[in-house]
From Swiss-Prot:
The keyword Transit peptide applies. Keywords: Mitochondrion, Repeat, Transit peptide. It comes from Arabidopsis thaliana (Mouse-ear cress). The keyword Cytoplasm does not apply. It is found in: Mitochondrion. Residues 1-87 form a transit peptide. Belongs to the PPR family. P subfamily. Residues 514-540 are annotated as: Disordered. PPR repeats lie at residues 154-184, 188-222, 223-253, 257-292, 293-327, 328-362, 363-397, 402-428, 429-463, 464-498. GO terms for cellular component: mitochondrion. This is Pentatricopeptide repeat-containing protein At1g80880, mitochondrial. PANTHER family: MEMBRANE-ASSOCIATED SALT-INDUCIBLE PROTEIN-LIKE (PTHR47939), PENTACOTRIPEPTIDE-REPEAT REGION OF PRORP DOMAIN-CONTAINING PROTEIN (PTHR47939:SF5).
Length: 540
């Protein structure tokens, strides 16, 4: 505990990812609506209106076709997740107080001020406080020290603090906290998984592997679930080759099996979507006499569908059924997507009927698998009809539903969709605005991008480093140097760390602008002198 207290003192001196019932398949009346004329189509507001009255059971944005990894033990991905299902509301002014006391000379002064305040702190509000300060790790850690003093530092709050520290690559402090947790007999298992994941996110694969290797020091014997957890952490952050290398190098201790190969296969299919590598892993499984299972087929079909390979998607689906493997909802979602994408909408509708015959029920992801490719193809009228059908089946739109429309609509409709997201209690989120800003800057619409930037306050979105950097880079790409410099200065004034490469680029653009201005002035002067000389010749 002494180590973490010492670090806390030093910091105090520093002023900074369903269950819904489905009554029946698409009714005949609904099927008719799909073929109705444009004049019968639902508008965005009418289609989304009922969404606000349907409780959404999907509160976080998941990448399209992101498949869960099923292991013989419980799902590994749960160990990397932070529980945000019930964040307690915070008292007004609490975060401002944390900011103010962080400016005091010592941790003792900061703690005294917090203790003297009228704010109450319990386990739930403490967890919410750390979450709200997640982008400013120093403030989050100061708040953690206060909660620790109040006895609010339960298991989940400690795990959250480790996640925050890992996000900011403050691994030494995180390890001090883990040691303190261990010394007071708190479970450090999830903390170790979080450290593996955060190291992988920071591209430090060697330290992720080392974390797995030292689990025994915290009385966690490296076991199959932890091994597969490491592979999952490496793959989910793009280090798929490293994960495969480690899996094969460890085969004496952890014999290769279908579950381990499925983690690697999922990486190539759903993280990178590399068909060539996915096919190689499929062949490699055969070389090790490992028979692909239901999940293996699901990953491959997902991969083929995302690149528009309808033939191989259907081929593997048929092969899967011949082997007696019942396709899950993920497989049908992939097939619905590729059929819709490849302009086989009627066949996709027939497949929806097939779902009922298989004892499965279409969910929000199934409908999103239609909506997204329709939006990508500019078929917004049909997409709106699918949305209306989805809502009529008591299925709630998800963040992915709204994002699909946001990528396809014009600027005026963008604001309307954002409003519907808020009504449906699905955001918008920081990721939503990153998507919109990226689209607008790509379309060379800096004026509209800045209008969206101004709209963030209305939706209670506080600009974070990712939003600042995306906006600054977008403005630079559109030649808006002065506005880019203005927003960069604003970012730094709020205590966010500057980006050296971006700073250099801003300075280079400034120098280029000065040089261009000087050249234009010289050219102007030269032309004026030439004009004067010509007049003097004419007079002679």
């Amino acid at each position: 505990m002494a180590a973490i207290v010492a670090i806390g003192r030093k910091l105090a001196r520093t002023p900074q990812w369903r269950i819904v019932q489905h009554q029946s398949l698409l009714r005949r009346a609904v099927s008719t609506s799909f073929s109705s004329s444009v004049s019968q189509n639902h508008s965005f507001s009418s289609a989304f209106h009922r969404a606000g009255h349907v409780h959404s059971q999907v509160l976080s944005y998941l990448p399209h076709f992101a498949s869960s990894n099923r292991f013989s033990t419980k799902t590994i991905s749960e160990t990397f997740d932070i529980n945000l299902t019930a964040l307690a509301p915070l008292e007004k002014g609490l975060i401002d107080l944390i900011r103010q006391v962080s400016e005091l000379e010592s941790e003792a002064d900061a703690m005294a001020s917090l203790e003297d305040s009228s704010f109450d702190l319990n386990h739930d509000s403490f967890y919410s406080l750390i979450w709200e300060l997640r982008d400013e790790w120093r403030l989050a850690f100061l708040a953690f020290k206060w909660g620790e003093k109040r006895g609010c530092d339960d298991q989940k709050s400690c795990d959250l603090m480790i996640w925050v520290l890992g996000n900011h690559q403050k691994f030494n402090i995180a390890w001090c906290l883990i040691r303190d947790m261990f010394n007071v007999s708190k479970d450090t298992r999830k903390a170790m998984f979080l450290m593996m994941d955060r190291y992988a996110a920071a591209n430090d694969t060697s330290q992720a592997i080392r974390t797995f290797d030292i689990m025994d020091k915290f009385k966690h014997t490296p076991y199959d679930e932890a091994f597969q957890g490491l592979l999952c952490a490496l793959c989910r952050h793009g280090h798929i080759e490293k994960a495969e290398e480690f899996m094969l190098a460890s085969k004496k201790l952890f014999p290769v099996d279908v579950e381990g190969f499925n983690v690697i296969l999922n990486g190539w299919c759903n993280i990178w979507t590399d068909v060539t590598e996915a096919k190689r892993i499929w062949r490699e499984m055969g070389n090790y006499c490992i028979t692909p299972n239901k999940d293996s087929y699901s990953h491959m079909i997902s991969c083929f569908s995302k690149v528009g390979n309808l033939f191989d998607s259907l081929r593997l689906y048929d092969e899967m059924k011949k082997r007696g493997l019942a396709p899950g909802i993920e497989v049908y979602n992939s097939l619905v997507y590729v059929l819709t994408r490849e302009d086989c909408f009627d066949e996709a509708m027939k497949l929806m009927k097939k779902l009922n015959e298989e004892g499965l029920k279409p969910d929000s992801v199934t409908y999103n698998s239609m909506i997204r490719p329709l939006c990508e193809a500019g078929k917004l009228d049909v997409a709106r009809n699918v949305l209306a059908t989805m809502i009529s089946e008591n299925l709630s739109p998800t963040v992915d539903t709204f994002h699909a429309f946001l990528e396809a609509v014009n600027f005026e409709k963008t604001l309307e969709v954002l409003g519907q997201m808020k009504i449906s209690d699905l955001g918008p989120t920081e990721e939503t605005f990153l998507l919109i800003l990226g689209k607008l800057f790509k379309g060379k619409q800096p004026e509209n991008a800045l209008k969206i930037w101004a709209e963030m306050d209305r939706f209670e979105i506080v600009a974070n480093p990712a939003l600042y950097l995306a906006t600054i880079q977008g403005l630079l790409s559109c030649g808006w140097l002065e506005k880019a410099r203005e927003i960069y200065s604003e970012m730094k004034s709020k205590g966010f760390v500057g980006n050296p490469m971006l700073q250099k680029l801003l300075e280079e653009q400034k120098v280029k602008g000065v040089r261009k201005s000087k050249r234009m002035n010289l050219q102007k002067v030269g032309s004026q002198e030439g004009y004067k000389g010509q007049r003097s010749v004419d007079r002679k």
